[in-house]
Amino acid sequence: MQPSSGMTLGQALKAADLVGSGGEAKVVIQGGEVRVNGEVETRRGRRLIEGDVVEVGDERLEVR
């Protein structure tokens, strides 16, 4: 599933099957492994908007 506008960063990672649980999302995000629009993001509650680009490792997702 593609992340959609209004989702939190943690929800988006789960929806895209990049993590298996909210706890795993927390670890990955707080570990500095996630970038939003090229910047490291450590807040899993960050709301995403249309056009945001989320990157985790080699995976790249665009919010629609």
Predicted feature residues:
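Short, charged beta-turn/beta-strand-edge "cap" motif at the junction between a beta-strand
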Residues: 58-63
